[in-house]
Amino acid sequence: MATGTLAWDPFVGEHADADANSDTADDENLPTFYIGHHEFKRPLPVTEFVLRQAGDVGYDMLTSPITSPHFHSRVLSLISNHIAEISAIDSSDAPNKATPPAPIIPPLDPVDTPFTPSDTVSQLIAYSSPWIDLCSPDPLVANISRQVLNIEIAYASFCGVGNVIIPGPRTHNGGSGNNGLAQYARAIQEALAIASYINVSIHMPMYGVEDQTEMTGDLLPFSRYQSTTDTSKGENEIDLYENWDAWNLIRDVCKYNSRLSVALALPRQLPIESLQSRWFAEPLKLLTFTQSTFLKNKGGHPVLGKAHQNLLTRYMKLKNPPWLLLCDVGPIPGLDDPNQQISVADGYAPPSVVQDAPSPTPAEAEQARRNSTKSQTKSKDVAAHLIYLRYLQRNQPERTPIEKFGSGYQDYLQAPLQPLTDNLESVTYEVFEKDPVKYDWYERAIERALSDWVLQKKPTSSLSGAVVLAVAGSGRGPLVSRALKASQTTGVPIEVWAVEKNPNAYVLLQRHNKNVWNGVVNVVKTDMRAWKGPLRNAAGPIGQAVTTSSTTPATTHGKVDILVSELLGSFADNELSPECIDGVQHVLAPEHGISIPASYTAHLTPILAPRLHADISNRFSADEHATDTPYVVMFHAIDFLATAVPDHPQIQQAWEFSHPLPVKTLHIAEARRGGGVSGGGGGSMSGGDGANEHNTRYARLKFVCKDRGVVNGLAGYFEAVLYEGGGKAENKVELSTRPDTIDAKSKDMISWFPIFFPLKACISFLGLYYYELLTYE
């Protein structure tokens, strides 16, 4: 919460608080609400005194119209004169009745606008004229409306305004697919081109028609054409997705411009959760509240229903939380009398003021909405709505550890790692090592594998009877430490081999072996696929130094009982885990050897991700392969399109890999790699000699999308079985990144973000849609 003098920079969307003692704003565990005040008939101009008074009450920002009533009157006179001229021509007896072109609005005069370049302007959100009609079927009204918008946007940009709100398309001109909406979208596209640095927010209701304040001088009555209406719907029937369809067309015409966003008007009765989730995925700049959005509690104070509170909590967890705008809830207190005693919205309020009110039925909500448009009821406190929102801010739930960790990663595109090609830096290893869940689960898998090994009385591959365990791709050694701990916990002795190709990590592993592991680990620097197995010195004990000279006694290579690796990628196999484990399987004991992980599966689902699509589209100019590249992303502002119920996506398995491979499969692969006759001569359908043909996968998946939407790409996840459990289901150890199973299998795991496969051409669909996916690996 911010109090005191406003100091807001609209270009970066940050607010500076003059009151440095505001503990709520400094609390990193709670979201900060930036709350603005909007009046349809705000007294002009908005002076420094008005801004200061608003800041003293607790507002962070104010809106202001770009042009004045004088400009409005001038435009109306221009239209009236032009229509009169047309009428005179039509009523004359002249043989050639050529219709004159639409008049051109003269440039602004000082009396036409309250704005001038100054610090005050930089602290305002501009609101374009609501009396224009960009959707009008009348070419004259549409032309004049477009001129007004362009004049306002150009002048606001000149003055240094950073954010402009434009009223959404009027729905009285027909459905979302009509020509009027296309006109509106092109007008917005033109406005964005005129002002290269202004952020434009389209003010739209979540569904239905927004409460319209009666306007004197509306251009609608000037239309000489009857507007078309959608007669296919009943009088009281509402198409819940109609407004989203309109927004989708606008941003599609504007090519997902990063400066285009939504100012979403919240109704008194919230729609179904699937529509709430759809808007959650969109670039929300503001959430707007009118008096009709609020309920009245027993004390007569405005409060939000539980559903609105939950929605606000969810939306405020976005990477860039929307600002909140109170619309026509009363004037700013103290403007008429600076000495007036006013309440300050500091987040503290008596229980009677913030006591919840029962949620209304749909009929009650509609009646309240109609009543609110007829008469504005006054609250007991002129700042009551602001006081309540500040109370909600102070009482927001703290962010969870996962939310804190992911705050900088939400919807941020990252290239998948290539550990086989690149030698990772220490800081990269460190990030993954911060995830205790993954390593706890690996340790649990090793513990159960060791315990079952003893219970099942399996022979070991060492002369001492210790279970031989190798960590293939040891990195900085976290799995080695967990393996030693598992041995200590179970009391089962192990012989540990740490294999690592990264020469820099190899240095650290040797240091750990000396200072942390007491020299009990055998550290080997090599690519795991080239490793021949544990070194066995015919004349010496197990664990002899790895590096030998020509005078060293003859050595042999033994087998490994348990092979541990952490080569999984966000889509299971996308970091070549199958190829790497196949390449080292020759060292695994053929009869009793265990691979951890034992198997893993890849999973897919279609999603709407407009923010990610916009980001990738912006990269395309510099990187022509941007749309062909998969990205690792911590998904947040997305909408699952194939769902059984809201927020419960239908995610389908694409394919599976298991380890160890059957010996016969390995022999065929080796024969093909060596060009042997037994390997055949057909090669591979994906090219090459066919040695990796056994890792080729194919999937055909079908998804049912119930609601209208746009497929921007595919979300990819994986599940892995680290240890099968030795025949006991309760001993099974699994990992998952799927949002519907992660809590049951590996809650709070953060090592892997999902993967995003973008579509070069988005797929739009209306109503029930069957999305069929054909994919190869």
Per-region residue spans from a language model:
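Class I SAM-binding transferase module
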Residues: 2-426, 433-434, 438, 444, ...
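Generic structural signal for well-ordered alpha-helical scaffold segments
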Residues: 443, 447-454, 484
